[in-house]
């Protein structure tokens, strides 16, 4: 098929002398007739020579059959033919090709342009929608890249600003994390450092007091004897009043606790000896009362704990 450039190069004498593959439609438009005259058809092959008569015959027998279905049936029938049956059609195709080469020596087969479906697919693609019709795909891709670069510079942010922002917002270790206090907290579960918070409820205070009296790991508590630890556990069971333990226990407090322990043990001994003395009993009760007051401390919201129970 000749393009418009080839038809301009050809001389008008050759166009007038060249045979046309098909007659022009008499009632057609001028533009359609011009295209039919300019287009040079390919020479028919053996199958086309054979199917020309068979197609017409099959179309007359089956008027409602589609042309594509007729072509499928003709192709299957052509494959069933033997070489001897195909020979005359092959010879006719060779003769037509020789005549075509003689009439059009500079003929070069050029495939048809894209069909309407392919053009429609290109039209609804991304570059086709963004640009006006008639722009080449290379120019469309360049235009899309330029638009992306334009949006990247909006609001004062450059193309590399996002990476810089991520570097600036990266999580860095605070210098205070390397301090000895923080390392001590990280490597030790110290319950003695907890302080009383007025916003805590009574249930939370009771839980923290029980945990502090049972699982405390401060050096002052580690120096106590097993007797003092048993006293602390007994005090936590008997005394359910919420209180916070002191951060450290001095030697004076340890001696007081040992004295209170002796008094509490002598209270439950059978009467006799020194235990029957009323003055000793009063001193024991007074020491136990002082022990509960020192252990309880100020109550919740500054109220006096119920030590008389």
UniProtKB/Swiss-Prot annotation:
InterPro entries attached to this UniProt entry: HMG_box_dom, HMG_box_dom_sf, SOX_fam, SRY-related_HMG-box_TF-like
Domain-level remarks: The 9aaTAD motif is a transactivation domain present in a large number of yeast and animal transcription factors.
Subcellular location: Nucleus; Cytoplasm
Protein function: Transcription factor with sequence-specific DNA binding activity. Binds to the consensus sequence 5'-[AT][AT]CAA[AT]G-3', showing a preference for 5'-AACAAT-3' and 5'-AACAAAG-3'. Inhibits beta-catenin-mediated dorsal axis specification by binding to sites within the promoter of the beta-catenin-regulated gene nodal5. Acts maternally as a transcriptional repressor of nodal5 and nodal6 to restrict their expression to the vegetal hemisphere of early embryos and thus establish germ layer formation.
GO biological process: brain development; formation of primary germ layer; negative regulation of BMP signaling pathway; negative regulation of canonical Wnt signaling pathway; negative regulation of DNA-templated transcription; negative regulation of transcription by RNA polymerase II; neuron differentiation; positive regulation of transcription by RNA polymerase II
Chain residue ranges for the region called Disordered: 1-36, 270-309
Transmembrane regions listed in the UniProt entry: none
UniProt biased composition (Polar residues): 278-293
The organism's place on the tree of life at top rank: Eukaryota
Keywords from the named record: Cytoplasm, Developmental protein, DNA-binding, Gastrulation, Nucleus, Repressor, Transcription, Transcription regulation
Gene Ontology cellular-component annotations: cytoplasm; nucleus
Tissue note: Expression is restricted to the animal hemisphere of the uncleaved egg and early cleavage embryos. In late blastula and gastrula stages, expressed in the dorsal animal and marginal zone. In neurula stages, expressed in the developing central nervous system including the otic vesicles, branchial arches and the lens epithelium of the developing eye. At stage 23 (early tail bud), expressed in the neural tube and around the anterior neural plate. Throughout tail bud stages, expressed in the brain, and in the otic vesicle and branchial arches.
UniProt-recorded name of the protein: Transcription factor Sox-3-A
Self-association and partners: Interacts with ctnnb1.
PROSITE patterns for this protein: HMG_BOX_2 (PS50118)
Induction entry: By bmp-antagonism. Fgf is required for maintenance of expression, but not for induction.
Residue ranges for the DNA-binding region feature of this UniProt entry: 40-108
Pfam family of the protein (one): SOXp
Result when mutating residue 55 to G: Abolishes binding to 5'-ATTGTT-3' DNA sequence
GO MF annotation terms: beta-catenin binding; DNA-binding transcription activator activity, RNA polymerase II-specific; RNA polymerase II cis-regulatory region sequence-specific DNA binding; sequence-specific DNA binding
Motif placement: 9aaTAD: 260-271
Disulfide cysteine pairs (residue numbers): none
């Amino acid at each position: 098929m000749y393009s418009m450039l080839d038809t301009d190069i050809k001389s008008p004498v050759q166009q007038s002398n060249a045979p046309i593959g098909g007659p022009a439609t008499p009632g057609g438009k001028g533009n359609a007739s011009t295209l039919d005259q300019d287009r040079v058809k390919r020479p028919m092959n053996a199958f086309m020579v054979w199917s020309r008569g068979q197609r017409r015959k099959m179309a007359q027998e089956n008027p409602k059959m589609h042309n594509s279905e007729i072509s499928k049936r003709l192709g299957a029938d052509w494959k069933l033919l033997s070489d001897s049956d195909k020979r005359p059609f092959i010879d006719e195709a060779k003769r037509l090709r020789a005549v075509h080469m003689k009439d059009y020596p500079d003929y070069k087969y050029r495939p048809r342009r894209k069909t309407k479906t392919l053009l429609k697919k290109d039209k609804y693609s991304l570059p086709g929608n963004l640009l006006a019709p008639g722009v080449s795909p290379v120019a469309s891709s360049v235009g899309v890249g330029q638009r992306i670069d334009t949006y990247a510079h909006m609001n004062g942010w450059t193309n590399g600003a996002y990476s810089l922002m991520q570097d600036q917002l990266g999580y860095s270790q605070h210098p205070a994390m390397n301090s000895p206090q923080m390392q001590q907290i990280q490597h030790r579960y110290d319950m003695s450092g907890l302080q009383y918070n007025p916003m805590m409820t009574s249930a939370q205070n009771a839980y923290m007091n029980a945990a502090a009296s049972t699982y405390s790991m401060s050096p002052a508590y580690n120096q106590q004897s097993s007797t003092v630890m048993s006293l602390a556990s007994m005090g936590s069971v008997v005394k359910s009043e919420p209180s916070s333990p002191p951060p450290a226990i001095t030697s004076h407090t340890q001696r007081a606790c040992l004295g209170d322990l002796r008094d509490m043990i002598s209270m439950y001994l059978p009467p006799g000896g020194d235990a029957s003395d009323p003055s000793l009993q009063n001193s024991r009760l007074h020491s136990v009362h002082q022990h509960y007051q020192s252990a309880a401390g100020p109550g919740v919201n500054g109220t006096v704990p119920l030590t008389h129970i």
